[in-house]
Amino acid sequence: MERHERAVARIRQGHVDLLFIGDSITQGWEEDGRPVWDIFYQHRHAANLGYNGDQTDNVLWRLQHGELDGITPKLAVVMIGTNNATRREDPPEETAAGIQAILATLRTRLPDTKILLLAVFPRGLSADDRLRQINNAVNERLPAMADQRQVFFLNLNRRFLDNNGGLPEEIM
C-alpha cells in the first residue's frame, strides 16, 4: 500500500502528461532504469504506476482508488498481464478481459487521453515455453481492443528476442 499511497500523492500534485501503467517491468524505470527515466520521461511530467507482481485486477483496483483522480494526461502507456500467467495461471481470455476492463476504465475516466497498449512481454527463455505461449495467446486478442482513435496497440516483443525466438537471460 505504501507505493500506492506515494502514487496517489504524486497524482494529487497534478501536471501529469504521461502515465505509465503496469507491473515490475514498468516499475523498473524508477529503479535500474532510473537514468533513462530521468533523461527521457521526467521532463515530460511522467508518473509511473508500475507495481512489482501486479496483475490486471490489481491495476484495476488502483485505477479506481485514486490513481486517476484529477489528472488529464496526454498519453497513458499500458503493459500488463504477464503476472496473470505466472502467479495464478489465468487462461488467456481472462487476462485479456482484465486488460479490456483496464482500457474501459481509462476510456471512461480519461476520455481525452490517448492510450498506447503494449503487448504482454514474453516469458520464458524459448519460444515453446508454456508461459510464453499463454502470453502470446493474450497478445493475439489485444489488437482488437485498439480503435485507432483513442487506443493504439504496439507489439515490440520481437525486438527483445533472438533469431530463434529465444529471450536472452540478461533481459529476463
Question: What residue spans do the PLM features occupy?
Answer:
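Serine-esterase "nucleophile elbow" of acetyl-processing enzymes
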Residues: 1-72
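Structural recognition of the beta-strand scaffold that forms the well-ordered cores
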Residues: 17-22, 45-50, 74-80, 114-119, ...
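Feature marks short, surface-exposed loop/turn motifs that line or immediately flank catalytic pockets
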Residues: 28, 55, 83-86, 124, ...
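Proline-centered flexible-loop/turn and helix-kink motifs
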Residues: 42, 111-112
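Surface-exposed cleft-lining segments at the edges of enzyme active sites
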Residues: 48-51, 82-95, 125-130
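Glycine-rich anion/phosphate-binding loops
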Residues: 54-61, 91-100
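Generic structural signal for well-ordered alpha-helices
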Residues: 99-104, 139-143
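Catalytic His-Asp segment of secreted/periplasmic serine-dependent ester chemistry enzymes
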Residues: 122-172
